[in-house]
Design a protein with these regions (language model features):
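Active-site acidic/histidine proton-transfer and metal-coordination neighborhood
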Residues: 20-24, 57-60, 76-172, 256
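Glycine-rich, proline-tolerant flexible connector loops at the mouths of alpha/beta enzymes
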Residues: 35-58, 106-112
């Protein structure tokens, strides 16, 4: 490994901590960036924390805000989505975030054809691009590998970005969990703005049955191939952050989350040495 790994903490890794405690956790772990979310009750940003407060707390500790997670479902464009996008883009700008994560519709009841889904994606990107430009932030598109998702693969997103002239404001989120679930083989390091990492250790569960609740910290028992995915991205030129995003309650309930994340960091450093 020719370059040091750059780690970040997604708010999902420790959703029960206060914002100051979460920032302190990042500092202690020598992670110089965080991601905040709009889907966690009781913490920022759902608790009404002003964006300026987030900016000030992070700046005081040398922490960068990578993103807000997430605009959903970004690829179903309507007046409600526009209002959500404007609100989140303003918050991202004001808190100093680099960008806004955008997740596609994940609904088994979505009866749209592939052509209709593709048209919806291109419409959304066309509408979102000027909003992102106006607010000076990036849009991080995160395909979800679940079978029912309207945008499963990064190749589809890349083609839509290029077709709509959005290369200046759109980047991909390479999520190691969703990359594995989608059975993807392609990597797009030149368009990857952020990497989400989490592990799965349940070897018995059928692939199609694996959900967010299976996602733990990356360790020896990981079946997603996190180290191999990260190595492939780094070898192809990716130099951005690796952001921990485990959803499992077993992680959220850990008595010593700092030690657990530290062990995962050490594991990845050793695996990628």
């Amino acid at each position: 490994m020719s370059q040091p790994l750059r780690f970040a903490l997604n708010r999902m890794v420790a959703p029960r901590l206060s914002l100051p405690a979460f920032i302190e956790l990042a500092v202690t772990l020598k992670a110089d960036a965080i991601e905040i979310r709009n889907d966690l009750a009781g913490v920022e940003i759902e608790d009404g924390t002003p964006p300026q407060q987030v900016r000030q707390l992070c700046a005081a500790h040398g922490i960068q805000v990578l993103s807000i997670n997430a605009l959903y479902p970004f690829d179903v464009w309507n007046d409600e989505r526009r209002a959500q996008a404007l609100k989140l883009a303003a918050y991202a700008r004001d808190c100093g975030a680099r960008g806004l994560v955008m997740c596609p519709l994940n609904d088994r009841a979505d009866a749209r054809s592939e052509a209709s889904r593709g048209a919806g994606l291109r419409t959304a990107l066309t509408e979102l691009a000027p909003i992102l430009r106006e607010h000076g932030i990036l849009g991080f598109i995160e395909p979800l590998g679940f079978e029912e998702c309207s945008l499963r693969r990064k190749r589809t997103a890349v083609e839509a970005i290029r077709a709509t002239g959005g290369l200046d404001v759109f980047r991909l989120v390479h999520d190691t969990f969703h990359h594995h679930l989608a059975g993807e083989q392609e990597f797009f390091p030149e368009l990857t703005g952020l990497v989400h990492i989490s592990g799965v250790e349940d070897r018995e569960a059928p692939l199609a049955s694996i959900r967010d609740g299976h996602r733990v910290l990356v360790g020896e028992g990981d079946i997603l191939g996190n180290a191999a995915q990260i190595e492939a991205l780094l070898e192809r030129g990716y130099s951005g952050h690796l952001s921990f995003e485990p959803f499992a309650d077993s992680v959220h309930g850990l008595a010593d989350i700092q030690r657990a994340i530290g062990a995962s960091i050490d594991h990845l450093k050793q695996a990628l040495a």
